[in-house]
Amino acid sequence: MTLNLCVLTPNRTVWDSKVNEIILSTNNGQIGVLPDHASIATAVDIGILRIRLNDQWLTMALMGGFARIGNNEITVLVNDAEKSSDIDSQEAQQTLEIAEANLRKAEGKRQKIEANLALRRARTRVETINAISELVGVPE
């Protein structure tokens, strides 16, 4: 049995295909979703979406939004999303370093909040690339 996963941003459909399982970062922690999961709607945090497709794990960086799960259908609506295969590791690392520097330089509450969000996004992109090696040990 499979799930139909659809990941949408305001500008495009990032994923629309059947999957075996996902692990989703929510505002309350990570949740695993298998076929026949209970119906829920949840906020999606800036974090990594892990997708099991047959015997292979794939990852995607999600930049916050909402998810609806029910009847073996998962719809994820996010501000932005990138598959790990689409992320340039050097560019992601440079963006992370810039975000860290900007957070150190931030003055005032608003600048610090914006810099912290940029850092979380940059860190998630780097972690998404590195997450595949971690998934090798995930039991099926």
Curated annotation (Swiss-Prot):
Membrane topology: Peripheral membrane protein
Keyword Plastid (UniProt): yes
Subcellular location per the Swiss-Prot or TrEMBL entry: Plastid, Chloroplast thylakoid membrane
Protease keyword on record: no
Keywords (A to Z) from UniProt: ATP synthesis, CF(1), Chloroplast, Hydrogen ion transport, Ion transport, Membrane, Plastid, Thylakoid, Transport
InterPro entries referenced in this protein's UniProt entry, alphabetically: ATP_synth_F1_dsu/esu (IPR001469), ATP_synth_F1_dsu/esu_N (IPR020546), ATP_synth_F1_esu_C (IPR020547), ATPsynth_dsu/esu_N (IPR036771)
A molecular function GO annotation: proton-transporting ATP synthase activity, rotational mechanism
Main location group: plastid
One CC-aspect GO term: proton-transporting ATP synthase complex
Intrachain disulfide bonds: none
Record's subunit section: F-type ATPases have 2 components, CF(1) - the catalytic core - and CF(0) - the membrane proton channel. CF(1) has five subunits: alpha(3), beta(3), gamma(1), delta(1), epsilon(1). CF(0) has three main subunits: a, b and c.
NCBIfam families registered for this protein in UniProt: ATP_synt_epsi
Protein family: Belongs to the ATPase epsilon chain family.
Function according to Swiss-Prot or TrEMBL: Produces ATP from ADP in the presence of a proton gradient across the membrane.
HAMAP family: ATP_synth_epsil_bac
Protein name listed in UniProt: ATP synthase epsilon chain, chloroplastic
Lineage of origin: Eukaryota, Viridiplantae, Streptophyta, Embryophyta, Tracheophyta
Encoding gene, per UniProt annotation: atpE
